[in-house]
Amino acid sequence: MRTLQVIYLEGKQRLQKAGNESPAFDAICLFEHVFHMNRQDLMLHGNTKQATLEQETEFFSLIEQRAKKRPLQ
């Protein structure tokens, strides 16, 4: 299992590589949805808390959909 910070940064990077116009914003929105944590929680606990395999899978699935231009809403 990886830390939440590592997972968030990888998601943001995948969106950047896909040419997303706002990768940081989109990644944090999806992160907040999957992990039920806000940005402050990520900053405070992102390097110590780990994701479950299910959470990680769901997050990256949503990242890939967003990379293919699926709207956030």
Describe the residue ranges of each PLM region.
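Short, surface-exposed acidic
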Residues: 20-26, 39-44
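A sequence-composition feature that detects small, non-aromatic residues
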Residues: 18, 24-27, 51, 67
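Non-catalytic nucleic-acid substrate-recognition regions in nucleic-acid-modifying enzymes
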Residues: 1-23
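Conserved AdoMet
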Residues: 31-73
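A general structural-boundary detector
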Residues: 14-18, 29, 46
